[in-house]
C-alpha cells in the first residue's frame, strides 16, 4: 500500500538481494480455477490497497497541501528522499515507531518546503475514516470473485499505528491472505514480497492477477509471471478484470446493495400488492435491493418477472411536520410527464401503510448513469463541460414549465417563497435540534432581516444536484430528474444556488462531495460564474447581485436537513449508512452558511459602485437604516457643503455631517453598534482581561465580531488608494475612515471587534500593497476573515529602535532559504493563541546603503526556533490576549518566497506601512479624548466639592475649554493629513503625517489626564476606561517612532521648505 506507487522506477535505485526465501514456492493444492476464454486460468486476485481499494495517499496529499498552504509535492518528495534509508521506507518496513517517523518525516518535509509542515495533520487525515473507505465497486468485485470460489489477497505497503496495530483500513474477512510490509520487513517492489504472497496462496505466478496503480510494482510482478492490471480508475480496472476472469464483477443494478436490516420491508405483502397492480403471475422470486444513496426517503430496486421498478417510501417512525412528502413527488412527476422535463414514469401512489409500514409510490426503473462525484473523475474535460451544460439546461426547462398548462399553478403558494422557506427550515431544525449551534442561531436571526426584495415564481425542484440526475450512458443527456419531494412554487435562484453547492465543498467532504480544492478550469467544469451566466442566458434574464444570500440560505437548508438526518440516525430511522456522520457536519454547514452571510453585500449605498456579480469580497455592506442623529455624536457648526465622491476628492470633510450619504449611514450604524452592543459589555470584557482566562480570546468579543461582520462593519480600514477595486475592504478614503476610526476609539475593544486593530491592519495593508498572490492567499485572506491574528517584529532591546537602520537582527540566505537570528521586543500580538504570522524586519545586507540593508519576511509562527521569552506590560497593563512579547529568533528557516517585495526593501515597506497606520492611531486617540471629555463633563455636573458643584469650579471650566480646543485642533490636523494622502499621496503628506504623530498623542495624554483629575481616585480605577486610555496614550508617544523623531523630521522639512514666506533680509548699514 501507500507511497511506493507514487514513484517512477527511475526514482529509486534498489539494490536487489539475490538470496531466495527460506521456503520455496508451494504448488497449488487444488481449489477452483477460473479459465478465461483465451485459455488462461486464474485462481486468485491480489489487490494493492492505496489507489486500488481506497484513495491513494498521493491524492490525499495533493488536497491536504492546498488546504494547509504547503508547497505542492512536498509530501511525495519526502517519501522519496533517502531511498531505503529514508524515514518512509523504514516506517513501512516496521523498523521505526510512528512517533520516530513523524519526527523525522516532519523535519524532512520542513526542509523540503522551507517552512514548518504539520505532518501530524496529514498523517491523521491519511488514516482517518473519511479517506479510507473502500471503493464500492471494488467491494462488489471482491464479493463476486469469492462467490465464484476464487481466492483474494491484499498485498500492501503499510505501517504500524501508535497503538502498535498495523494500519489496514479494510475488512480482513474479504481476503484469504493478507501480506503487510510492516509485519514482513520487506516492501514492494521487492520481488520477495510478491513471492511470499504467492506462497501463502499456494499458487504459481501464472495463476494470479495483481492490481496496483504504480508501474514499478506492476513491472516486478509481471517479471515473476503474474498477470497485472494498472489501476487508474477503479471502475475501469474492474472492467478489465471482468474481461480476464470472464464473469461479471458488479451487481446488476448500479448503486444498489442488499437491504440493510434496519431498512427491511415486508416482501410477501409487497409482492402480493405488486402482482395485483401489474397483473403479473410469475412464480419466480421478487428481487429487492436498496439504493445506496438517498438520505431522506428510503429507495429500493425491485425486479419482478420482466418488470424493473423503483419504490420510494417514507421513513418509519415519527417524522417532522411536512417532511418526506412522497405524495408531492408522485404528483409532480405525474404532472411533468408531458411537460418537457425528463422524469421517470410513475405507476402508483399507495397511501395504505398496512402493506409495508408507510406510504410509498412506484415508478419505472430508468437505466443510466448517476454521477455521485461532482468532479466527474475519469471523464474527458469536454465531457465534463457537456454534462454540466446539460444539467444547466434541464434546470432551465424546470423553471420554464407552464404552470397553468400542467395544472401546477396551485402546487404551492405564489410569492414569499424565501421567507416561508426560512421559517420552514427553522422549524425543521428546531424540531430536530440536539444541541445549540451558534452559527445556526445567528443565521436564524440574520436571514429574515436580509431577504431578497424581488423574487420570481416558477416551479422549483428544491434539491437540484448532479446526483439527482440520471444521464445517458453514452452522451451528455439527462434521462430523468429524481427526488422531487421538496418541489414547490418558488424562487428559481434558490435552485440555481443549491445546484452550486459542490463549488464550495471539498472533495473529502462526506455525504455531499465537492471540488473546492480542485481546479475546475483544468477539469473542464464551468466556473460558478460561468454556470450562473449560462443559466441567465438560457432563461433570458439579467443576473442577480445578491448571490451570497442565496448561498447562505442554501447551506442553512443543508444544515437543517443534516440535523434531521442525524436525529433520525439516533433512532435508526435514517436510510443511509452515512447518516450518523451528519451530526458532525451540521455545524460545519452552518459555519459555511454564516461565512456567506457575512460576505453578503446588499448594495445599500446607492452612491457606491456596484460589486461584480459573484466576485468574492471580504467586506459586506449592511442593510439600510433610517437616518437619525445618534446619541453622543459630536456636532460642529462648520459642515461641508457637499459630499465628495470617491472619484472627485475635492473638499476636506471636517465633520461626519459632510460625509456622503452612504458613508454617513455607515458612520451612524457604527455609532449605534458601539452604543448598543459594546458599551454595555465593557465591564464584563474588562473582567475577562483581568481573569485567569485572559490569554484566551473572549467569547463576547468573538460574538461581537460575528455580529459586526453580519452588519457589514468589517475591514473598513483599507484605503481606496491601496484597494481600488474594493476586493478586500470597504473602499473608503483615508478621510472617510478617519471619521469612523474616531468612533472606534471611543471603546478600547472596538478595533478588534471590527477587525481594524493593530498590528493586523498594518500587516494586512502591506500584504495588499506588496504581497504576491500566494502570500495573499496564505496570509491575507485568513487575516481579513478574522480566522488568524498576526504580529510585527521590528523593535530590539539592544539598540535605539527609533532609528530603524540600527536593527541588528540578521536575515541570511542559506541552502535556498532565509535563516533568521535576532532578539526582538514589544512585538505586539505575539502572545495571542490565534497569532499565526510574524512580519519580521532584519538586515539582509549590512554593507548596502543605510536604507537598503533591511528586508521584511513573512514568518509562520509555528516555525522552529521562535521563543517568546516573556510578556511585557504597559504601566502594568498586559493587554491580553495579544499582549506584547520579548522574543528570540534562533536559526529560524523561512522559504525564500516568503520575502516581501525583495531583499533590501524593508525600510521602504515600513514607511509605506506607517502612513495610514498613523492616521488610525491618531484618530483613535481623538476618540479616547472625546470619550474622556464626555465622561469628565458628566462627572463634574454630578459632584459637589466645597459647597458647590465641580462644574462651577474655575479650574474645571478652564480644563474643559482647553480640552475642547486641543481636540478640535488635533482633529483638523489629522483630517488635513488624511486628505493630503487621498489627493496627493503619502509622500506629499509626509510633513503632515509627522506633525499629527507629534501632536495627537501628547494632546490625548493631557486631555485624559484632566479627566482623571476631575474624577479623583475613581479615574485611576478599572471602573472607568480612563486609566487604560491614559496608559495607551502615553505608550503611543513611542509607537511608530517617538515624539522627538517626528519633531526632528518636521524641523528638517520646515528648513528645507523655501516656499514659506520669509522675512526680508535686514539691510546692512
Swiss-Prot record:
Q: What is the lineage of its organism?
A: Eukaryota, Metazoa, Chordata, Craniata, Vertebrata
Q: Which Pfam families match?
A: Acyl-CoA_dh_1, Acyl-CoA_dh_M, Acyl-CoA_dh_N, APH, Hydrolase
Quote the function comment for this protein. Answer: Acyl-CoA dehydrogenase only active with R- and S-2-methyl-C15-CoA.
Kindly state which reaction or reactions the protein catalyses: a 2,3-saturated acyl-CoA + A = a 2,3-dehydroacyl-CoA + AH2
Where in this protein does the record say N6-succinyllysine is found? 413, 427, 1052
Report the superkingdom from the record.
Eukaryota
- Record-annotated residues binding FAD? 792-802, 828, 943, 1013, 1044
Which Gene Ontology cellular component terms are annotated?
mitochondrion
| Protein name in UniProt | Acyl-CoA dehydrogenase family member 10
PTM N6-acetyllysine: list the residues.
427, 1052
Amino acid at each position: 500500500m501507500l507511497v511506493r506507487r507514487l514513484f517512477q522506477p527511475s526514482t529509486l535505485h534498489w539494490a536487489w538481494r539475490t538470496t531466495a526465501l527460506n521456503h520455496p514456492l508451494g504448488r497449488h493444492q487444488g481449489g477452483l480455477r477460473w479459465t478465461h476464454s483465451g485459455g488462461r486460468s486464474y485462481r486468485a486476485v491480489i489487490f494493492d490497497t492505496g489507489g486500488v481499494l481506497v484513495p491513494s495517499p498521493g491524492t490525499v496529499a495533493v488536497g491536504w497541501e492546498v488546504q494547509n498552504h504547503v508547497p505542492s509535492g512536498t509530501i511525495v518528495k519526502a517519501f522519496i528522499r533517502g531511498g531505503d534509508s529514508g524515514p518512509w521506507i523504514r516506517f513501512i518496513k516496521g523498523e521505526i515507531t510512528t512517533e520516530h517517523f513523524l519526527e523525522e518525516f516532519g523535519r524532512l518535509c520542513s526542509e523540503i518546503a522551507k517552512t514548518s509542515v504539520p505532518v501530524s495533520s496529514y498523517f491523521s487525515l491519511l488514516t482517518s475514516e473519511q479517506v479510507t473507505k473502500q471503493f464500492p465497486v471494488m467491494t462488489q468485485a471482491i464479493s463476486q470473485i469469492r462467490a465464484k470460489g476464487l481466492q483474494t489477497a491484499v498485498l500492501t505497503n503499510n505501517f504500524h499505528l501508535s497503538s502498535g496495530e498495523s494500519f489496514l483500513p479494510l475488512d480482513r474477512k474479504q481476503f484469504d491472505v493478507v501480506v503487510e510490509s510492516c509485519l514482513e520487513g520487506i516492501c514492494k517492489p521487492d520481488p520477495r514480497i510478491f513471492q511470499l504472497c504467492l506462497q501463502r496462496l499456494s499458487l504459481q505466478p501464472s495463476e494470479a492477477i495483481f492490481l496496483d496503480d504504480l508501474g514499478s510494482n506492476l513491472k516486478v510482478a509481471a517479471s515473476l509471471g503474474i498477470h497485472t492490471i494498472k489501476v487508474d480508475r477503479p471502475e475501469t480496472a474492474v472492467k478489465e478484470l471482468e474481461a480476464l476472469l470472464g464473469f461479471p464483477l458488479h451487481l446488476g443494478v448500479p448503486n444498489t446493495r442488499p437491504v440493510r436490516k434496519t431498512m427491511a420491508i415486508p416482501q410477501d405483502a409487497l409482492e402480493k400488492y405488486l402482482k395485483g397492480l401489474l397483473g403479473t403471475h410469475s412464480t419466480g422470486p421478487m428481487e429487492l435491493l436498496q439504493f445506496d444513496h438517498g438520505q431522506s426517503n428510503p429507495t429500493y430496486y425491485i425486479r419482478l418477472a420482466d418488470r424493473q421498478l423503483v419504490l420510494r417510501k417514507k421513513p418509519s417512525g415519527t417524522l417532522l411536520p411536512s417532511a418526506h412528502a412522497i405524495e408531492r413527488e408522485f404528483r409532480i412527476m405525474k404532472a411533468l410527464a408531458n411537460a418537457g422535463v425528463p422524469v421517470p414514469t410513475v405507476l402508483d401512489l399507495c397511501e395504505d401503510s398496512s402493506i409495508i409500514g408507510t406510504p410509498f409510490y412506484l415508478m419505472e426503473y430508468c437505466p443510466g448513469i448517476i454521477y455521485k462525484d461532482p468532479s466527474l473523475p475519469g471523464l474527458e474535460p469536454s465531457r465534463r463541460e457537456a454534462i454540466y451544460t446539460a444539467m444547466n439546461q434541464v434546470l432551465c426547462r424546470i423553471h420554464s414549465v407552464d404552470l397553468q398548462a400542467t395544472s401546477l399553478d396551485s402546487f404551492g403558494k405564489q410569492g414569499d417563497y424565501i421567507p416561508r422557506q426560512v421559517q420552514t427550515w427553522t422549524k425543521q431544525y428546531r424540531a430536530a435540534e440536539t444541541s445549540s449551534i451558534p452559527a445556526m442561531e445567528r443565521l436564524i436571526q440574520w436571514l429574515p432581516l436580509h431577504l431578497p426584495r424581488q423574487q420570481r415564481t416558477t416551479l422549483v425542484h428544491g434539491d437540484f444536484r448532479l446526483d439527482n440526475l440520471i444521464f445517458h450512458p453514452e452522451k451528455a443527456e439527462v434521462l430523468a430528474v429524481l427526488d422531487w419531494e421538496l418541489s414547490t412554487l418558488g424562487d428559481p435562484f434558490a435552485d440555481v444556488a443549491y445546484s452550486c453547492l459542490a463549488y464550495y465543498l471539498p472533495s473529502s467532504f462526506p455525504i455531499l462531495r465537492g471540488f473546492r480544492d480542485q481546479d475546475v478550469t483544468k477539469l473542464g467544469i464551468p466556473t460558478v460564474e460561468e454556470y450562473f451566466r449560462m443559466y441567465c442566458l438560457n432563461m433570458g434574464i439579467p443576473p442577480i447581485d445578491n448571490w451570497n444570500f442565496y448561498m447562505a440560505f442554501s447551506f442553512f437548508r443543508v444544515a437543517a436537513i443534516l440535523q434531521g438526518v442525524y436525529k433520525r440516525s439516533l433512532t435508526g430511522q435514517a436510510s443511509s449508512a452515512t447518516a450518523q456522520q451528519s451530526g458532525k457536519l451540521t455545524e460545519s454547514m452552518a459555519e459555511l452558511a454564516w461565512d456567506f452571510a457575512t460576505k453578503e453585500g446588499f448594495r445599500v449605498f446607492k452612491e457606491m459602485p456596484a460589486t461584480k456579480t459573484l466576485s468574492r469580497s471580504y467586506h459586506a455592506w449592511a442593510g439600510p437604516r433610517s437616518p437619525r442623529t445618534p446619541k453622543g455624536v459630536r456636532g460642529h457648526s462648520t459642515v461641508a457643503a457637499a459630499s465628495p465622491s470617491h472619484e472627485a476628492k475635492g473638499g476636506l470633510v471636517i465633520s461626519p455631517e459632510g460625509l456622503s450619504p452612504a458613508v454617513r449611514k455607515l458612520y451612524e450604524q457604527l455609532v449605534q453598534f458601539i452604543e448598543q452592543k459594546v458599551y454595555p459589555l465593557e465591564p464584563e470584557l474588562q473582567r475577562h482581561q483581568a481573569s485567569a482566562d485572559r490569554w484566551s480570546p473572549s467569547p463576547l468579543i468573538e460574538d461581537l465580531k460575528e455580529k459586526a461582520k453580519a452588519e457589514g462593519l468589517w475591514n473598513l480600514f483599507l484605503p481606496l488608494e491601496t484597494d481600488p477595486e474594493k476586493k478586500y475592504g470597504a473602499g473608503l478614503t483615508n478621510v472617510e475612515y478617519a471619521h469612523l476610526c474616531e468612533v472606534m476609539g471611543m471603546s478600547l475593544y472596538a478595533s478588534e471587534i471590527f477587525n481594524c486593530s493593530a498590528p493586523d491592519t498594518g500587516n494586512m495593508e502591506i500584504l495588499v500593497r506588496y504581497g504576491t498572490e500566494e502570500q495573499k492567499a496564505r496570509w491575507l485572506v485568513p487575516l481579513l476573515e478574522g480566522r488568524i491574528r498576526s504580529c510585527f517584529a521590528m523593535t530590539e532591546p539592544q539598540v535605539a529602535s527609533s532609528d530603524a537602520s540600527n536593527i541588528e537582527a540578521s536575515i541570511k540566505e542559506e541552502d535556498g532559504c532565509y535563516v533568521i537570528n535576532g532578539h526582538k521586543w514589544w512585538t505586539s500580538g505575539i502572545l495571542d493563541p490565534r497569532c499565526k504570522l510574524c512580519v519580521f524586519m532584519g538586515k539582509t545586507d549590512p554593507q548596502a546603503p543605510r536604507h537598503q540593508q533591511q528586508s521584511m519576511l513573512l514568518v509562520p509562527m509555528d516555525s522552529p526556533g521562535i521563543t517568546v521569552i516573556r510578556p511585557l506590560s504597559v504601566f502594568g497593563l498586559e493587554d491580553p490576549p495579544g499582549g506584547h512579547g520579548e522574543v528570540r529568533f534562533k536559526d529560524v528557516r523561512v522559504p525564500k518566497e516568503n520575502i516581501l517585495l525583495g531583499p533590501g526593501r524593508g525600510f521602504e515597506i515600513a514607511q509605506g506601512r506607517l502612513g495610514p497606520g498613523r492616521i488610525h492611531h491618531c484618530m483613535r486617540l481623538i476618540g479616547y479624548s472625546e470619550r474622556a471629555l464626555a465622561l469628565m463633563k458628566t462627572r463634574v455636573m454630578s459632584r459637589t466639592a466645597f459647597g458647590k458643584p465641580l462644574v462651577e469650579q474655575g479650574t474645571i471650566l478652564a480644563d474643559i475649554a482647553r480640552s475642547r480646543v486641543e481636540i478640535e485642533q488635533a482633529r483638523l490636523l489629522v483630517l488635513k493629513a488624511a486628505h493630503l494622502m487621498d489627493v496627493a499621496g503619502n509622500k506629499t503628506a509626509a510633513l503632515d503625517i509627522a506633525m499629527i504623530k507629534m501632536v495627537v498623542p501628547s494632546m490625548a495624554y493631557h486631555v485624559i489626564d484632566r479627566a482623571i483629575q476631575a474624577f479623583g481616585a475613581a479615574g485611576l480605577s478599572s471602573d472607568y476606561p480612563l486609566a487604560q486610555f491614559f496608559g495607551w496614550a502615553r505608550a503611543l508617544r513611542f509607537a511608530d517612532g517617538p515624539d522627538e523623531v517626528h519633531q526632528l523630521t518636521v524641523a528638517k522639512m520646515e528648513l528645507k521648505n523655501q516656499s514659506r514666506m520669509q522675512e526680508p533680509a535686514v539691510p546692512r548699514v
